[in-house]
Each structure stands twice: as structure tokens, then as C-alpha cells.
Amino acid sequence: MSTLRKVLLFFFCCSLCGFAQTADELVSKNLQAKGGLEKIKAIHTLRTAADLDAGFFKAKLSSESQRPDLFRSNTIIQGMTAVQAYDGSSAWQISPFNGKKDPQLMGEDESRGLIEQADFDGPLVDAQSKGNKIEYLGHDQVDGDDAYKLKVTLKNGDILYYYLDPDTYLEIQIERQQFIRGSVRESVTLLGSYKPVNGVMYPFSIEAGPKNDPDSRAKITFQKIEANVPVSEADFKIPAATAAKNPSAK
């Protein structure tokens, strides 16, 4: 019996090692499918233009981002522009739809998603140095089709579930769990229509919204994604006059 236990323990440990290796292998295949780490790292800025259709309203979207974690998005509806931005240390926004036409610093909870989005390469690249943990959870289904499932636990405690196409190894769905003040917020993002930009594959079609309410999801269609274009770091920073009124922005 003792020998049998040792044999079973040996195979159990081997299976755990293989499980861990599979997560690394899938991440490697995903990055290779996108164009390879060298080409990914060769992109330093991005500019996008897109159309958003949320059913009851439509909007024009644009964004600029710069390595490693500068990000700004603009949402235009009926001539009014909402802004959300992160300068690497502070997140801020302009919300004219809520009657706030002056830039305002964002709180920790409301800025979490924006800061995650500002990660230029995403959580799979340099995961360990970012404090992210990646696990392989086996196979799962996305709209009836098979997919590899990865669990990504971010440094801040939020969890992402990546679903990879078994043929292309590109992500086709990402589920997000945000843990805020004792509650869990769940959302889902569907990705498709991948096209190369400077040798790196990007999704030109996205559908995003609450996980359990498909009718509330918004569809985003990218008209243009440009890489290594000139951007101004000043665009990511909260305007000086506002920052002076908010010492915590420094």
C-alpha cells in the first residue's frame, strides 16, 4: 500500500507540473498568435477610432495609449465629449452627460477598470513581474464551441477568465470579476474580426457588458487602429488648473 501511495503521489505531482506548464504554453501560443513578443513590444503607442452601438444610443469612440500605462478615451454623443484618462498615477474624467464639464479625479473603485485598460500589453504579458497569477482551467464552451480557459488573478485581486480559440489561440471571450466593497461585479467581453496592425493581431469587433444581461451589451466596431503614431503625454494628464485644486493628483 505504501508503494502504491508513492506511485499515485508521483503521478499526481507530475500532473500538477503539466497543468502549470500548460498555462505557460497557452500564454506563449497566444502571444505568438498575435505576432510574437518582439513585435508586440515594438509597438509603443496606439490610436483607435470606433463606433459604439448600445441599442438605445450610439456614439463615436476614440482612444490614445502609450507604453507602459498611459491611456485616454473619448466618447462623443450628440456633440458632447466624455473623457476618461490615466497618466500612470492618477485617473480622471470629464462627464458632461452627468452635468460635470470640468475634469474630476476618479476614486479608487471607479478607476479600477480604467487602470486595467491602461496596461498597454495586457495582463498576459510579463504577468509575473506585474503580480498577476495565471492558471489553466481546462476546456470550456463559448457559444457551443470548445475553448481553452485561463484564470488570471490580477495583483489588485480582480479575476479575468480568458477563453482562447483552440485553432488560433487568440482570445475570443474575457470574463471579468471585480471585487469592490464586498460585492462582485461581473462583465463579459466578446472579441472577433482580428486584423494585423504593424504585424500584431487586434480585434476590430467587440461586444461588452454585464455577464448575465446580453441585451445590455454594447457593440464596438473599430474603424481604425494605428500603431506607433505621435501622441502627446500632456493629453493623458489632468489639466493643470484642476490638478492645482486637487493636491492628491500630484
What residue ranges belong to the model's regions?
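A residue-level signal for beta-strand positions that form part of recognition/binding surfaces
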Residues: 45, 131-133, 219
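N-terminal mature ectodomain segment of secretory-pathway/periplasmic proteins
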Residues: 24-99, 135-138
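A short, sequence-level motif marking secondary-structure junctions
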Residues: 63-70, 87-90, 109-110, 165-168, ...
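Positively charged n-region of N-terminal signal peptides that target proteins for export
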Residues: 1-6
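Flexible, processing/modification-adjacent segments and terminal tails
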Residues: 19-32, 39, 92-158, 178-185, ...
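Gly/Pro-enriched, hydrophobic low-complexity segments
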Residues: 80, 145-237
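A generic structural signal for short, non-catalytic loop/turn and secondary-structure boundary residues
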Residues: 9, 41, 127-129, 201, ...
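Bacterial N-terminal signal peptides
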Residues: 7-18
